[in-house]
C-alpha cells in the first residue's frame, strides 16, 4: 500500500501563508516522482478557501463534532464539513484530549459519525511519558484504539486511519525507535484481528506521529506496520512536506 503523509497545521497559518505554501509546494513537488498519498489538516476557518488554493492536495479538518447540528457553540459538525466538500478529519489528537477534555467516548462518537457518512477518520492514540516509562504503552494504546472503534463495522474500517502519536514525542525531539513502534502496532493489529478479518486489519492504515522529520522518517517508513506519518511542525514548510512525500514513495 502507498504511504500516507498527513501534515497537521494545528493553529498555524493565515490565508497568505496558505497561498505561499502552495507556491512552494508546486515548485518542489515537480522534481519528485510521487508515489505516496498526502493531505493537510487545515484550521477550520480556512477549510473552504484552502480546498481551492491547495488543489491537488487533499484537505481535511482537525476536528469534527459528532452531531449533525445543534446548540454547540464554537463547534463544526461532520455534516457541515461534508457540505464544504471536506471528507475527513483528524480525531482525538492528544492536544484535544489534554486541553479540551476530549474523552475516549467522544472520540468514538466522532469516529462513528464520520465513517457512517463515508468520511475519513484519522484517529489519534498515544501514551504519556509516565505510561511509557511504566511499560504501559501497549495497554494504553490498545485501550484507546478499541474504544475509538467500538461499533465500527468491518465495512466502515476502510475509512479509518489510526495515528499512533506517543504524547511524550510530540514536539519534544524525543522519538521511539522504528522497531519499538512497529512492535507496538503489530500487537494492536493482532488484537484487532480478533474483532475484524485478517484482510481488513492488514489493510488498515496506521501512521506514526511525534517529532517526525526527514532525518528519522526513513526508519519509520521501512517498518512493515507503519504506513506513513502524521506530522506537525516539520510540515509547516512546503519543502519539508515534499521531502516526506518523496521519502514515503521510496
Swiss-Prot record:
It catalyses: D-glyceraldehyde 3-phosphate = dihydroxyacetone phosphate. Disulfide bonds: none annotated. It is an enzyme of class 5 (isomerase). GO terms for biological process: gluconeogenesis; glyceraldehyde-3-phosphate biosynthetic process; glycerol catabolic process; glycolytic process. Transmembrane segments: none annotated. It is found in: Cytoplasm. Gene3D superfamilies: Aldolase class I. Homodimer. PANTHER family: TRIOSEPHOSPHATE ISOMERASE (PTHR21139:SF42). This is Triosephosphate isomerase.
